[in-house]
Amino acid sequence: MAAQRRSYETGHKPKCLVIVDDTTEWDRAVYYASRWAIRSGGGVVMLRIIETEEQNQQWLGVADIMRAEAREDADAALDRAAGRVNGIGAITPERIIREGDPVAQILDAIDKDADLALLVLAANPGPEGPGPLITMITGVIGSFPIPVTIVAGDLSDTDIDALS
């Protein structure tokens, strides 16, 4: 069961959850989330998900090395995104790194932070479709505990400024 949202109660402030992944359009989601935070007086929470496969015990040492490398990559990606958020609105975003199924990790992050008021994703504008995360989320979007905003991946900063 989802936690009661407290974003606008006294002593709380609304926060936007944005997913930082390896797609080319992640920057559009980060830009929109930053602009939203400026306008709403809220904050930005950046989530990076490391997708893990079932580990074969025989290869556990290799899996540990791969996990450590994935964590370093996740930190580097969040560093880039945090620089972008800070450059847009002088906001210091919260950072979360999780491992596992992306949809389950997003839902768990939302459940654990009652101040999260919005999930922002960006869609790939190309012919290959909106991207794997959006494809996964659309299957359960009707039961999401917070609103989901999908930003078109080909919107410019100026376009997003006008919309947010």
Descriptions of predicted regions:
Residues A37, V85-N86, V140-I141:
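A generic structural signal for well-ordered alpha-helical segments
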Residues R6-L60, S143-I146:
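Small/aliphatic-rich secondary-structure junction motif
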Residues M1-G11, N86-L119, A162-S164:
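Structural beta-alpha unit
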Residues A29-Y32, D108-A109, M136:
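A short acidic, amphipathic alpha-helical/loop segment
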Residues Y32, E69-A81, Q105:
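Short, solvent-exposed amphipathic alpha-helices that sit
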Residues R6, R48-A76, T158-S164:
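Acidic, proline/glycine-rich short linear motifs
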Residues L118-S143, L155-I160:
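Glycine-rich, Arg-bearing micro-motifs that act as flexible, cationic patches
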Residues V45-L47, E94-R98, T149-V151:
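General small-molecule cofactor/ligand-binding pocket signal
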